[in-house]
Structure formats: C-alpha cells, structure tokens
C-alpha cells in the first residue's frame, strides 16, 4: 500500500491598518494646531496609511481668522502645515460669499468634496468634486463622498444651491462598486448621519460634523460607524480601519484630547502664536459688572446697539448670531465683540406696521421651538395653544401696546431679512454690521449691565 502525503502551505493574508484623524466644527480655534500637527507626524512615523479629514465649519468664532485681511486664510495656512487630505464644506464656509470660499479652496492643499453643493453658471465658486478616492499600497481603494448641511445664509450665495444631503447620497450608491471601503465625510449633524446610515448601508464609516457632538467611541447604526469629535479643536477623532483582502474586518473610533498632549510642532506653533498676537483684538472697549447669564441678555445688548446705530424704534437680533451662551463679568475686548458675533452681516432698516412685525416674529418661531429673535424697543409675548402653535403675538413699548396704524423704524441684520422678509419690499441696506454697532455703542456706554433683562415671554392659552 502506498501512502501519498500532500503538503499544503497556508499563506496567511496580511492585514493593513488605516488611521484617519478628523476634525469638525473648529470655528477658527487655532490654539491646538501645534499639538495636532505633532500628533499626526508621530502617527506617520509609525505607519504608512494615515490620512487627515476635515468635516467642515473652519471659520466663524475667532477674529484672528475671521477678520484677517484675507478672510479665513490663516486657518487654511495652518491646515496645509498638518497637512489635511480631504475636506467637506460646512455651512459656515459660505458665510463670506462665493468668491472668498473659492479662494480658500484654491489656497488649500486638501481635496474638497461636496456632492450636494451645486453652483450655477457664472458663480465665482466652481463645483467641487462630489467624491474622491484614496488608494493604499496594497491596492485597496477608499471612496470618500462629501455632504453639506443646507443651513447657510442663502442671500450670501445666490448662485449656489445646497440640495438634500441624504437624497443626494442615495444617488451615489454605485460608488460602492468602484472602491472596497466607502466613507461619507459629512457636515449635516449626528441625527442626519444616523438617518443616512439607516437609509444607505453602503457606508463603512460616516465622519461627521455640524451638531458639535462628542462621540467618545463612535456609534454603530446599521453596521455603519458614525463618528464626531466635539468642536473648537479640543479633540481630534481617530478612526482605525483593519483591512484584510481589501475588505474591512475591524473598525473603531476614539477621541484624542489635545489638551492632554504635551508635544508641539514648533513651526506650526510659531505660526499660531503669530496670529494670536494680533494686538487690535486685545484692546478693551468696555466692561460688564455682572456678566451675561444667557443668550437673551447678550442678544438684548446687540439689539440695543443695532437700534442706536440705525436710529430706529425697534431692532431684532437672531440667536444664531450670538455665539456665546454666556459671558463672564469683567472687561470686554474688541476680540470679544467679534467672538460674540462673527458674521459681518450688514444691517438693514425697514418701516413696518405692528402686523408686519408679528408676521416676522411668527415666521421665526416656526423655524424653532423657542423664541430666536431678541429685541430692542419693545417687549413681545408669544401666545401659544397646547400644541405649541403661536396663536397671537402681543407687542408693547414703554407707552403700552403699539399703534396698529403706525409704521415703526425696524432694524435687523441681513440673515433675519433673508429668512423672514422675502415677501416684503426691500429695506435700506447700510454699511454697518452688528460688530461695528456694538463697538460704537460701547464708546457711549462703556459699562453695560443686562443682568436679568428679559423682553420675551411665552404664554399658553
């Protein structure tokens, strides 16, 4: 009897590790860029497949970035030092208009993706690519689809349309056939990311922004890993993918607290220090003995400043344009003014009847469950039914109810005008902004106390 012995050599398939460092909702906070750059460089010394993603909202929040001569340029210069590989646009990227956004994209070494951002012919902004591919040395191809929230100020981008991100993503299901790993790089918020994962199982990972959510270990929805890393560059996200035979066999996420890191990239930190040293933002222009406890107190100050600047009876400011939730007692600097409101919206003067003012307020409430229009010159009460629907708005000034037959001078910024005054005759646009009005107001009122100020009431019928 003959026995044949067959030898089988088992070749174990090698695995590849991919690391994606991500940031979202930085809003001009540049102080930790030195630490981030050092951290990324250390990872790249350890392994070859390290990428850096930006999930939107680079600007609006720090005057050294927002008020630079070339608006937004400092943060792009710092990003290029890291460097970033892929970016999606946040809604705030559109706040400086189409031409400035185009200049920032041209300045950046990062690839910008935005599948649902559509530019009309003649726009200074040119369509970004909807997606891009990253290829590993083993041949694995990673597809990255970009999606952006539609909550920008449409009046600033008349030639750009931002269409529904989830519906748009569904049109790119075929992208999965062209890559082995598929990532959505989004600025649509955690809830929308969850909806996207539910409706479209093609994504292995969604790297998100917009809602400023901290997801310490990420969340799994429909087998998709959803990540987000807070805001203001306090953290970076670290997504790790384990790939075997060109397919993901493991994925995980952690948030890295940059404030706990000690190593700093010297070149990047010198650039950060250069920008932070800008002297004009350190000038003290006022003080507040009790501070501001909430947005309404800050918004009331801003509305008073707008009313004074435009010489009107009534003025409104929007909660979206108050970037601080509260403000401590003490000095107020020029930098603080541009942090409280970082938008540079022009101020507009209208002549409105009480009925038209009610319509303005009612429209604003339909977009939010809470009052969002802070006011000067009057108080108003929202009268709601048990379902929370506004049935009436009462308006009073210091003399009592407004005269229904009179037109009042009313001031507001272009954001409020664009969203709630579409069907009204255009107002008179001025060169003033909320920031300049605040600076002028503090020249005449260097000490401001708005503690306990409340001009809005809600009454249930």
Briefly describe each language-model feature range.
Residues 16, 23, 29, 45, ...:
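Catalytic centers of hydrolytic enzymes
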Residues 2, 6, 34-35, 188, ...:
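Short, motif-level signal for alpha-helix interfacial/capping segments enriched in acidic residues
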Residues 14-264, 297-305, 351, 366-373, ...:
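Acidic, metal/ion-coordinating pockets
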Residues 1-2, 58-59, 156, 221, ...:
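General secondary-structure edge motif
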Residues 1-16:
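Bacterial Sec-dependent N-terminal signal peptides
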